[in-house]
UniProtKB/Swiss-Prot annotation:
EC number: 1.-.-.-
Compartments, record wording: Cytoplasm
Swiss-Prot/TrEMBL keywords: Cytoplasm, Oxidoreductase
CDD domains found in the cross-reference section: MDR7
Molecular functions per Gene Ontology: oxidoreductase activity
SUPFAM superfamilies per record: GroES-like, NAD(P)-binding Rossmann-fold domains
Alphabetical list of Pfam families matching this protein: ADH_N, ADH_zinc_N
UniProt similarity note: Belongs to the zinc-containing alcohol dehydrogenase family. Quinone oxidoreductase subfamily.
Enzyme class (EC, first level): oxidoreductase
Organism for this UniProt entry: Schizosaccharomyces pombe (strain 972 / ATCC 24843) (Fission yeast)
Cellular component per GO, a single term: cytosol
Protein name (record): Zinc-type alcohol dehydrogenase-like protein C1773.06c
Broad class of the protein's primary localization: cytoplasm
């Protein structure tokens, strides 16, 4: 017997997060492996699923947890490239291997339409696995599937608009995706501006290498000073995690032919922007706006190569023991974290 967490409904919130016993799977189908999970990390998505706020496909009851890493315990038939004892991490979409995502691919999300990683053992398809970076701990590896791959896709997923040395990159916030975007953009030789409502978090961003920072609480109309920081050129890439409240300003400081990667909607809702004005700004800047829905196994492998080559280490804010998942959810919900919140499983 082993322990796992299960989300049973969308109304009980974090109170339903209690360890439950289950039988460790022994039979594997061809192409499957049994992974003994060592660590997992939290995402905003995991939190809102328990509160009925998740707008995408969901099949309850489900073991939550979008991110996880561990060691292969058992290998099924017809598995190539992996063997018992390998350290691995699973892609968020288990059926998104490469290219343009399909409905089939995006309906294979860990912790949503199939059981996730807040459990001791998980059966996973081998085609969704990636060999873990050799330079990272399991707590660090577990932060990669959602936040890191999303940031990587936002910066490098469009062949026509990959970030280049000397580009200006605007990163909103200092959560998981934003922190990875800062690190990857710097590794590519870009100039990076970071926004946050916390001077403490902005100081941390500077320590990571941020070129400029803006406190949007002190400067609510931050687009103009952000633009000045680029000498009027604007930003070639914007990592946009705010949504309705921040998008108009992101567009206002975009460079000509710049790319906005739409990733989230974590900012409090603002007044609905004047759509005609927004369209005018998009046209004026020849703007590119691209929705980012995590990424593929192929992107994950490319990202791991970069992490190893540049010795990039994820920012882990706090690690909780396995029996304190509810406390971990509450901590992340408070938005006190910088980078990632991790659950140590074993």
């Amino acid at each position: 017997m082993a322990l796992r967490y299960v989300v049973h409904d969308e109304i009980s919130g974090f109170d339903q997060l209690k360890p439950e016993e289950y039988e460790v799977p022994q039979k594997l189908n061809p192409g499957e492996v049994l992974v003994k999970l060592k660590a997992a990390s939290l995402n905003y998505r995991d939190l809102i699923i328990t509160k009925g706020l998740y707008p995408l496909p969901l099949q309850l009851p489900v073991v939550p947890g979008s991110d996880g890493a561990g060691i292969i315990e058992k290998v099924g038939e017809d598995v190539e490239g992996f063997e018992k004892g390998d350290s691995v991490v699973c892609n968020f979409f288990t059926n998104y291997l490469d290219g343009t995502p399909t409905d089939f691919a995006t309906h294979s999300a860990l912790g949503g339409t199939r059981d996730g990683c807040f459990q001791k053992y998980a059966v996973l398809p081998a085609h969704a696995l990636v060999h873990a970076p050799k330079n990272l701990s399991f707590e660090e590896i577990a932060t990669l599937p959602c936040a890191a791959v999303t940031a990587w896709n936002g910066l490098f997923g469009s062949k026509e608009h990959q970030v280049k040395p000397g580009n200006n990159v605007l990163v909103l916030g200092t959560g998981g995706v934003s922190t990875f975007a800062l690190q990857f953009a710097l590794a590519a030789g870009a100039n990076v501006t970071v926004t946050s409502s916390s001077d403490e978090k902005l100081e941390f961003a500077k320590k990571l290498g941020a070129t400029h920072t803006i406190n949007y609480k002190k400067t609510p109309q931050w687009a103009s000073p952000a633009l000045k920081m680029t000498n009027g050129v604007g930003y070639h890439h914007v990592i946009e995690v705010g949504g309705e409240k921040t998008l108009p300003q992101s567009i206002a400081c975009l460079a000509k032919d710049g790319m906005i990667s739409m990733i989230g909607f974590v900012a409090s809702e603002g007044t609905t922007p004047n759509l005609t004005s927004i369209i005018g700004q998009i046209l004026n800047r020849n703007a590119n706006i691209r929705g980012i829905f995590v990424g593929s196994v192929s992107m994950f492998r490319d990202m791991v190569a970069c992490i190893e080559a540049k010795d990039i280490h994820p920012v882990v804010d706090k690690v909780f023991p396995f029996d304190q998942l509810k406390e971990a959810y509450e901590y992340q919900w408070s938005q006190a974290h910088i980078g990632k919140v991790v659950l140590k499983i074993d």
